[in-house]
Swiss-Prot record:
GO BP, one annotated term: tRNA wobble position uridine thiolation
Record's protein name: tRNA-specific 2-thiouridylase MnmA
GO cellular component: cytoplasm
SUPFAM superfamilies: Adenine nucleotide alpha hydrolases-like
Organism encoding this protein: Prochlorococcus marinus (strain MIT 9515)
Amino acid sequence: MLKTLKDKKLENCSSINNKSKKQKHIVVGLSGGVDSSLSAALLMEDGWKVEGLTLWLMKGEGSCCSEGLVDAAGLCEDLGIQHNILDSRVIFEREVIKKTTEGYESGYTPLPCSMCNKNVKFEEMLKFVIKQKEFTYIATGHYARVIKSSCEHINNSENFQFKDFLLLRGADRNKDQSYFLYSLSQEVLSRLILPLGDLKKEETRKEALRLGLRTAKKPESQDLCLVEHYGSMQKFIDNHVKTKNGEIKHINGKTLGTHNGIQHFTIGQRKGLGIAWPEPLYVESLDKQKNIVYVANKNDLLKREAIIKEVNWVSIEAPIKEIEVEAQIRYRSEPVKGILVPLKSKDNLTKRFKLIFEDNQSSVTPGQAAVFYKGEILLGGGLISEFSKK
């Protein structure tokens, strides 16, 4: 049966509870993998009327998405549910392929999964549900949780202005995917069910085997869909980003070599620089205007501050004064303490914030997401646009 939160204090706060499942239609986003497959099966077992929805994202036959479509269709046939396919290739091309390309051309290291979640996956699912009318909720196989902010057991010692629904980390910290969901809206959260939020990965496999799902033994995907489609991120870059030769310089100004495009480098990179130096050097920054890759010693990668743009406050109202947060600046990194300071713009809207780390951080990478937490609650997040020295 579908689990709610293991923390009994929060059990009645789950967005699953108190929603009458009788005659409630739910659309499950199916990728063809075990996580989304199990989500659909568990919801059915728990009494929901389920249909599957697969987004057709990639152009060309034989792509990862084509394989996913086949697996998702087979799963729906096994479960005896309707399988819907939504052609989202145009919007995916515009919002993910194009913007990822532009990011690399600008000297950033983009985060395609975040782009897809923000502008494609959840928006397309929401539009589908609203258009069909008989559907009420959407579900995915993400390892994260949604609860109601009215829960009396929520700790709000900082007096945040909580919105109606809160996004929480998944119970399995090793699989937690909330980092990629920071851009979701309250409209999405109000309809979103995450059946795997309280499961560990090993439990997912066991449940899939128990239910006899065809995807139960399917290998877990370790790559972005772009990587699976093109073979590697390098091949994607070669296919989409124009090459422009430039210099590799030490931050002291000495020219050490040349490169064939800043898109081939990312902050903190050590391998593949093709330069000689008495000690290891790392990519310290990328200057798009001058087309220069700057390298430095490891200690020079440490940064004290970063500017975060396009901030979305998913669980709280935008703060008007500085707040203390736990910031996660890479998917697999541990959150670090910091202070977030609002920066006013010309239109007096606060979409940019200065993040001041308690301890200097290495490899602060423009284009990646900085996501802000308070304990298990994801407050919001945005994109790293620039950083300052120690």
